[in-house]
Swiss-Prot record:
Function: CRISPR (clustered regularly interspaced short palindromic repeat), is an adaptive immune system that provides protection against mobile genetic elements (viruses, transposable elements and conjugative plasmids). CRISPR clusters contain spacers, sequences complementary to antecedent mobile elements, and target invading nucleic acids. CRISPR clusters are transcribed and processed into CRISPR RNA (crRNA). Acts as a dsDNA endonuclease. Involved in the integration of spacer DNA into the CRISPR cassette.
Gene name as annotated: cas1
Disulfide bonds: none
PANTHER family found in the cross-reference section: CRISPR-ASSOCIATED ENDONUCLEASE CAS1, CRISPR-ASSOCIATED ENDONUCLEASE CAS1 1
Similarity annotation: Belongs to the CRISPR-associated endonuclease Cas1 family.
Coiled-coil segments on the chain, per record: none
Keyword Cell membrane in annotation: no
The protein's name in its UniProt record: CRISPR-associated endonuclease Cas1
Annotated InterPro entries: Cas1, Cas1_I-E, CRISPR-assoc_Cas1, CRISPR-assoc_Cas1_C, CRISPR-assoc_Cas1_ECOLI, CRISPR-assoc_Cas1_N
Keywords on record: Antiviral defense, DNA-binding, Endonuclease, Hydrolase, Magnesium, Manganese, Metal-binding, Nuclease
Originating organism: Clostridium sp. (strain SY8519)
Amino acid sequence: MPRISDRVTYIYVEHSKINRVDGSITVAESRGIVRIPASMIGILLLGPGTDISHRAMELLGDSGTSVAWVGEQGVRNYAHGRSLSHTSRFLELQAKLVSNTRSRLQVARKMYQMRFPEEDVSSLTMQQLRAKEGARIRKIYRKMSAEYGVDWNGRTYDPDDFEGGDPVNQALSAANVALYGLAYSAIAAMGLATGLGFVHTGHDLSFVYDIADLYKADITVPVAFEIASEYEEGDNVGKISRQKVRDKFIGGKLFATIVRDIQLLFGIKEEEQLNVEPLSLWDNREGNIKYGINYSNENED
C-alpha cells in the first residue's frame, strides 16, 4: 500500500460497473474494461449510473482508498467511505486546535500567511485577513481576465443549474469541485474531520474549503480562464475542466503537497508525520510478497 502522498489523485467514474480482480478494481463500460490497482487511488468518485460490487468495496476499504458518491459533473457530494489512517491522533489534534480561540486563530493566520508569503500577517485580525484575501482574489480575477481575453462579470454559481453559467463560471465550478474532492480525499485519508474548519465554519465541509482555498489562485482559476478562452459552442466544459485540473494535480504533485501542508499547519513534527506502511504477506523464501493476490495453482481443484 503506497503512502497517501504517492497515490493517484482521483478517478471519476460514471455509467459503469465496478468489480474486483485480485488487488485491482475493474471498470466496465461501453468502450471496454479497465483494470486499476486499488492501492494506487487516492479517491474514487462514483458518478451517476455507477454500480459497484460488494467485493470491490471490500478491496477499496482494505486498501484505504477514499470513496465518494457524487452527482453529475461532480457538483454534489452525497456520501463517502473510510479513511486511510487508522489512528485518531491527528483528529484529536485538529479538535484541540479548533476548540481553542488562540490556537484556532494561529492556524487560520498560517493559512493566510501561505497566500501572502512576503508579508507578516501574524498581528492581523480575522476581519483584516478576510478583507486582504478578498482584495487578492479580485485582483487575480482581473489579471486572468486580461491575460486570457475573457470577460469577467463576477462569480456566479447555481448548483442546480450548472449549464446556466457562462463558460468561465462553469469551468471554475467544475475545477473547484475537483479540487474539493482532492482536498477531501487527503483530509479523510488522514483521519481528520472535514467539518472542523479554522476559517470556514458551520458546514460539514468547512475544513475542505479551508484547504482548497490555499491552492485555487495557482490552479483552478488559471485553468478556468484558459478553458473559457478556448471555448467553442457545444464543448463539455465540466469534462474539459476536470481533465485539465487533474493534469495540474498530477504534474504539481498536489496531493502530496496537501498532506504536507496540513501537517505543517497543525505543527506536527517531521518524525510524527503520517506514513502508511505497505501491507504485505510474509514468505520465508521470497521475503515480503504482494497482498491481495490469489496464489493458488489454477490447475488445482
